Regions:
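Short hydrophobic/aromatic beta-strand micro-patches
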Residues: 34, 104-106, 140-142
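Conserved PLP-binding catalytic core of the aspartate aminotransferase-like
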Residues: 78, 87-121, 137
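PLP-dependent enzyme catalytic core of the Aspartate aminotransferase-like
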Residues: 117-121, 130-162
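Short acidic/glycine-enriched loop/turn segments that link adjacent beta-strands
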Residues: 27, 99-100, 132-135
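Nucleotide-activated donor-binding/catalytic signature segment of Leloir-type glycosyltransferases, i.e.
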Residues: 5-9, 13
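PLP-dependent aminotransferase class I/II
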Residues: 12-89, 93-96
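Conserved PLP phosphate-binding loop immediately N-terminal to the Schiff-base lysine helix
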Residues: 1-4, 23
Length: 162
């Protein structure tokens, strides 16, 4: 899903894009925004002259030009998301619908314990307690093997808590 089409209708929005997730370039800390000429002009007034280093710029441009990588990444993310949703539905675990590379799952009062068990099993996920959502965990969509491992260890942790 994209909000880019809203730019033609509204002149007071900025659509931001990151290279962190789908392009797997989180370490270079680069992104861009799409907006009306008026908004871009205002940003130019406060923008630092050298806010993104040369290497990061080159990596970002190369990423945009590599359509095959983007297509494959989207396919892997979509199939991984579909798999996780099917498994979570089977387990009776609710989740928030998303168009990102992660899924937010709701585990209720057992969230912290499941989180601790999964961490001890080598599954790295994010607790959303610091964001005011103590009964939710954020799970990044991984490879097929990683997703299978997550579900296997999630099932194991839920059994331990029964």
């Amino acid at each position: 899903k994209s909000a880019v089409n809203l730019l033609a209708k509204y002149n007071n929005i900025v659509v931001t894009r990151s290279f962190s997730k789908i392009y797997a370039l989180a370490g270079i800390r680069v992104g861009y925004g799409l907006a009306s000429a008026d908004i871009v002009s205002e940003f130019d007034k406060i923008r630092q002259p050298f806010n993104v280093n040369y290497i990061a710029q080159k990596m970002a441009v190369a990423s945009l030009e590599d359509g095959k990588y983007l297509k494959r990444s989207l396919e892997l993310n979509d199939s991984g998301m579909e798999f996780l949703k099917l498994e979570l539905n089977e387990l009776g675990i609710s989740y928030l619908n998303t168009y990102t590379n992660f899924i937010t799952i709701h585990l209720g009062p057992r969230t912290q314990k499941v989180y601790e068990i999964l961490l001890s099993e080598g599954v790295i996920l994010r607790s959303l307690e610091n964001y005011g959502l103590p009964s939710y965990l954020r799970v990044t969509i991984g490879t097929k093997e990683e997703n299978n491992m997550f579900i296997k260890k999630l099932k194991k942790s839920l059994k331990e808590l029964k």
